[in-house]
Amino acid sequence: MLRLPLVLVWSLWASLTVAENGLNGWLRYAPIPCDGRCHKALPSRIVALNSTQGSPLETAIEELQTGVRGMTGKRLSVAKENNCNLHATALIATVEEYRRTCRNSSDIPDLDVDGFWLRTEGNNVQILGQSERGALYGAFEYLSMLAQGDFSSVDYSTSPHAPVRWVNQWDNMDGSIERGYAGPSIFFAQGQIVPDLSRAKQYARLLASVRINGIIVNNVNANATLLTPQNMDGLARIANVFRPYGIRIGIALNFASPDTLGGLGTYDPLDPSVISWWGNITDSLYERIPDMAGYLVKASSEGQPGPDTYNRTLADGANLFARALKPHGGVMMFRAFVYDHHINESIWTNDRANAQVDFFKKLDGQFEDNVIVQIKYGPIDFQVREPVSPLFANLYHTNTAIELQVTQEYLGQQCHLVYLPPLWKTITDFDLRVDHSPSVVRDIISGERFNRPLGGWAAVVNVGTNDTWLGSHLSMSNLYAYGRMAWSPTDDSVEILQDWIRLTFGRDQHVLDTITDMSMASWPAYENYTGNLGIQTLTDILYTHYGPNPASQDGNGWGQWTRADHDSIGMDRTVKNGTGNAGQYPAEIAEIYEDIDKTPDDLLLWFHHVPYTHRLDSGKTVIQHFYDAHYAGAETAQGFVPQWESLRGRIDPERYDAMRTRLVYQAGHSIVWRDAINNFYWNLSGIADTNGRVGHHPWRVEAESMQLQGYQPYAVSPFETASNYTAVVTTSNSTTGTASTTLDFPSGTYDVGVNYFDMYGGKSRWSLYLNDKVVGKWEGNSEDVLGHTPSIYLDGHSAIRITFNGVKVRKGDRLKIVGVPDGVEPAPLDYVVFLPQGVID
């Protein structure tokens, strides 16, 4: 495959002089080295057979013109008449129109719906789609090749893995986004659809370029007011924006809408008045949006209304909507995320992980053929590691789709770098061995394994108005990769990532290698410093889903239990002695999970309750593995900062600085995670770290041990989220606090870190002094910078570190920190750490 040589000086000049904020994502169409030879390798005109205004073919023309001009400076003309002459031409059409106009079909490969054929030879380019949407995908593919410097001749066809490739937005009518970390909604504000949908159009471009064909625009915890006539008109405007990109819109529904909006006094799915009401609503929507994709419903879960109120089945509920949609060709996506969040942990056999199979298996075959059951990838809730949901192996006669999460609800909320495809592939590549036959999850959701007509993919994305879309430039790799995987799930995670890097940051080899190394290390690192051995992400499940709080997993009805006590830990999900969850899997898989000696260590605590002293395959005990993994993960995160800093001057300053800020934050917050989890289990088990690290921090100065004026000690809760379990806060919200001490460290050059708490509801200010000389000043404004769910408490969510590098310190120097409170935030401090070169606290 021929790639044009990179003119390094020219490309560096381009990257340094063009400021980029991330809004274009991977569709930058940035200039590439292109001389006369390059121009000759490009077509000079575009012929689009039977293109109509507002069609995906017209969009393809616009993208080809914009892309080629942006990358090479060459302007492509558009032929006004249909012409099959390929000389110096990019011909784009549907297969049907090409056969009709050009009367030549001998060499066209067979394509599925949305598939395309791309053939390039010299400056002749042929793009044929089975549909107009497929032709648009082919145009984006050609532009992607050019953007990566690939001008080679190709001749290949590709078709989608599954017909449904949707994204879900959890946008609320007031403009907020549930589990969104990048600003308010691009669709809604103040109970209505926003008047300016320009960002929605840009989002449609990005989605179409990775072959997404459907979007649910509102939160699954839906508001019935979306169905007012005014808002239906607004939805039609959204559909008009997405239609030229081949994307059909759908909406999430509130099951009780016939009562709360329609005033019927009931929402019984078998009541004739309810059936009629939904039929009328559906007809009204299709009058406005003839190509509407369909509905998504969350019912009978987490307080959302559902058919169980009337002793009806989930199939009764799903079929209510499916039958209303069927005359219009719409799809009914029904979430399998149904469970009781008030179950009793004291009953050993209770298990939220059993809920999906318990609710849905008995209904297999009772759903209409346009219903797809949308199943989260694991049995609980988007954890850092879960086994495959057993429901995939228990629905033989029902269409299914997998639900992934691009938004990092439990995985660092875009403030921690976590490249997700390696995690997703542990699920999609897993062979469930149904009836002792190959039953790979990706083949189940495509419909191939059980011969189902529908199926596919859904991902919760939650972009916002932030210029980066997701809050973090590097998190966009997950959205790009999701689209690629939904089209072709056997694609390699590294190859997908590197295509995204070249499209997003250019073709500099050092940039490519560095971001690849960081990204591929990121999920293992996050798993290491959050939750190991299948114990789940040990975050605060009762509050933000962000920082550490392992105690929150237990003692409540939400069912994300660890059953940790002073001696042992883990869920016993065996049939023999536990909840029976292992028995929900096909026999070959059940045998593995039932037997502790066969269960892989990375899922040990998911399926087995063991003593902390249980030996793993590595020879380590469970508790020592916890300690070691948390230290290893945090150490990896520290390395992300110098790796990124090696890219200074190779990436434009705006994106470089924004990403460096997040990686520096992640390095500090990974230490918070490491210490919190290790201290919690050390305190619980009483078993010390054999390497003597946990609870031993010789380079720290605890704030409460310093001389305090205007500050007072404060017992932090959860206790483990503060070093030595204690912070200091100002004595009042109007009192300036001072903490000072004389340093006893050897003279030398140190990186000085200050761990503090940045609470929501105030922006305190701090100043750090050595011998009354200012080392640095900062403000507690992370809520304006980072975007994760904030906290009003001193805890693992608000805990944060700032570091001042290369500070010269002499033994006997006087350290002083002055904190000025603001609002409800009492300028809280945890500790100061003095790190010699090469030392990780």
Swiss-Prot record:
Its EC number is 3.2.1.139. Residues 1-19 form the signal peptide. It is found in: Secreted. It is an enzyme of class 3 (hydrolase). GO terms for cellular component: extracellular region. Alpha-glucuronidase involved in the hydrolysis of xylan, a major structural heterogeneous polysaccharide found in plant biomass representing the second most abundant polysaccharide in the biosphere, after cellulose. Releases 4-O-methylglucuronic acid from xylan. This is Probable alpha-glucuronidase A. It comes from Aspergillus terreus (strain NIH 2624 / FGSC A1156). The gene is aguA.
